[in-house]
């Protein structure tokens, strides 16, 4: 899924050296810890100690273990204590976003302040009365707003990944792999600690290798303080604008509004936003089939175990379920030249989306399949953070060749051979 980038140097809102008061108070309020997970206790202990460093630390704060004098040395002691606390509670915090954010934040901060992993640790000082004139505590972002939490912790915007499935189905994975699949039945597009998405496919016609998505099931898993578990299910000719329980949000919890469902075009386009995990999903219906598109935070997409490794968005279609180029080039209900002309109108670049469109229109005989490929490309244009990856050109997914194209290429090869032997 790609390597996690290092956070840039963190600064306070006023540009002063990183005292971390703002960041640590953020961690204190990361409220979706599991009932057994003790990450909130670790956060509180760390906050308690680092608050004493806001003014640069006391004169007798130990040096060593970090650069920048006493305050930095004290900070390293606090970070080592924080890291030790997270290790002790790691077993019960699997899949908890507050825990994983804390672990990665500790690692980044120890690198920034040149803290050694071995060395003295600190115990949080006793809390004293509030100092007069200290002013209100810094504002903290909504614990159910993933992007705001991440930005405050890491000093940068989070990374996002994009996956889509449409048409035959064709799958664009998080790794920008593009496959045409023959999968039938129910297959998981996503299966991680926060989200489960399953697509059910059936043949476009009796005896055909090509299949289309007829049903999509999405489960937003329970997250304490943010949402109740919610299930969304769409089928061909039944694209509801609500979850299965009739609701349009995450429930009555404080962060219930961080999950919402909206419809741009009733019966054909539904958008689900899950701000608490930095995720947006679009489900569409075109030409008697469903399509799926997602933009998801990297940390969320990575939060799965070895037992959850079969995910089309992660690994693409299994090799045994991928249609070869020769299979994609077989004559369908519409001539390839005609399909190419129809697809070219909305997809001028002959990339993987264009190739998929030609295949779908040719096999199904339905020109409306052009809309599915065009919509998938439009979603990618919005969801991708790097538009250099918008157009994909898979090695084994070249556009179906028309007889005229084949003839031109053959003549070109013959001309080169003739020229070489002269």
Curated annotation (Swiss-Prot):
Subcellular location, record wording: Cell membrane
Domain of life of the native organism: Eukaryota
Signal peptide residue numbers: 1-35
The keyword Transit peptide appears for this protein: no
UniProt keyword terms in alphabetical order: Autocatalytic cleavage, Cell membrane, Disulfide bond, Glycoprotein, GPI-anchor, Lipoprotein, Membrane, Phosphoprotein, Signal
Topology of this chain in the membrane: Lipid-anchor; GPI-anchor
Disordered: annotated span: 116-138
Biased composition range(s): Low complexity: 128-137
GO biological process: activin receptor signaling pathway; BMP signaling pathway; cellular response to BMP stimulus; intracellular iron ion homeostasis; multicellular organismal-level iron ion homeostasis; negative regulation of BMP signaling pathway; negative regulation of transcription by RNA polymerase II; positive regulation of transcription by RNA polymerase II
Disulfide bonds: 144-226, 163-313
Marked site positions, Cleavage: 168-169
Pfam families on file: RGM_C (PF06534), RGM_N (PF06535)
A cellular component annotation (GO) from this entry: plasma membrane
Main location: membrane
Molecular function terms, GO-annotated: BMP binding; coreceptor activity; signaling receptor binding; transferrin receptor binding
Propeptide residues according to the Swiss-Prot or TrEMBL record: 397-422
Subunit structure, interactors included: Interacts with BMP2 and BMP4. Interacts with BMP6. Interacts with BMPR1B. Interacts with TMPRSS6.
Family: Belongs to the repulsive guidance molecule (RGM) family.
Function: Acts as a bone morphogenetic protein (BMP) coreceptor. Through enhancement of BMP signaling regulates hepcidin (HAMP) expression and regulates iron homeostasis.
Name of the protein described by the UniProt record: Hemojuvelin
């Amino acid at each position: 899924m790609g390597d996690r980038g290092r956070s840039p140097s963190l600064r306070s809102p006023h540009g002063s050296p990183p005292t971390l008061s703002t960041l640590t108070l953020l961690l204190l309020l990361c409220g979706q810890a599991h009932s057994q997970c003790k990450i909130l206790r670790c956060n509180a202990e760390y906050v308690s100690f680092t608050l004493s460093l806001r003014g640069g630390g006391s004169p007798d704060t130990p040096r060593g273990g970090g650069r920048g004098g006493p305050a930095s040395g004290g900070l390293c002691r606090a970070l080592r204590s924080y890291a030790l606390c997270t290790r002790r509670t790691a077993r019960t915090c699997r899949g908890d976003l507050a825990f994983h954010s804390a672990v990665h934040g500790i690692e980044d901060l120890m690198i920034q302040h040149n803290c050694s992993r071995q060395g003295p640790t600190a115990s949080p000082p006793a809390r004293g009365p509030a100092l007069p004139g200290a002013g209100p505590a810094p504002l903290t972002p909504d614990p159910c707003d993933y992007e705001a939490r991440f930005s405050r912790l890491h000093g940068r915007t989070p990374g996002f990944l994009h996956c889509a499935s449409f048409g035959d189905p064709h799958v664009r994975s998080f790794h920008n792999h593009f496959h045409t699949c023959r999968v039938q039945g129910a297959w998981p597009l996503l299966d991680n600690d926060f989200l489960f998405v399953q697509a059910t496919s059936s043949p476009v016609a009796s005896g055909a290798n090509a299949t289309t998505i007829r049903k999509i099931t999405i489960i937003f898993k329970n997250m304490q303080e943010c949402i109740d578990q919610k299930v969304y299910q769409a089928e061909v000719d039944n694209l509801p604008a609500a979850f299965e329980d009739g609701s349009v949000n995450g429930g009555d919890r404080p962060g219930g509004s961080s999950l919402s469902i909206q419809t741009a075009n009733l019966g054909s386009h539904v958008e689900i936003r899950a701000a608490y995990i930095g995720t947006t999903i679009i489900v569409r219906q075109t030409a008697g089939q469903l399509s799926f598109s997602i933009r998801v935070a990297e940390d969320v997409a990575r939060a799965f175990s070895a037992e959850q490794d079969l995910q089309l968005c992660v690994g693409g279609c299994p090799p045994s379920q991928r249609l070869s180029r020769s299979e994609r080039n077989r004559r369908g209900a519409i001539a390839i030249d005609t399909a190419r002309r129809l697809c070219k109108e909305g997809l001028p670049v002959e990339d993987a989306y264009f190739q998929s469109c030609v295949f779908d229109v040719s096999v199904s005989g339905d020109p409306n399949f052009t809309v599915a490929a065009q919509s998938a490309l439009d979603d990618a244009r919005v969801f991708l953070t790097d538009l250099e990856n918008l157009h994909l050109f898979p090695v084994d997914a070249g556009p179906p060749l028309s007889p005229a194209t084949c003839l031109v290429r053959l003549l070109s090869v013959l001309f080169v051979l003739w020229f070489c032997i002269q």
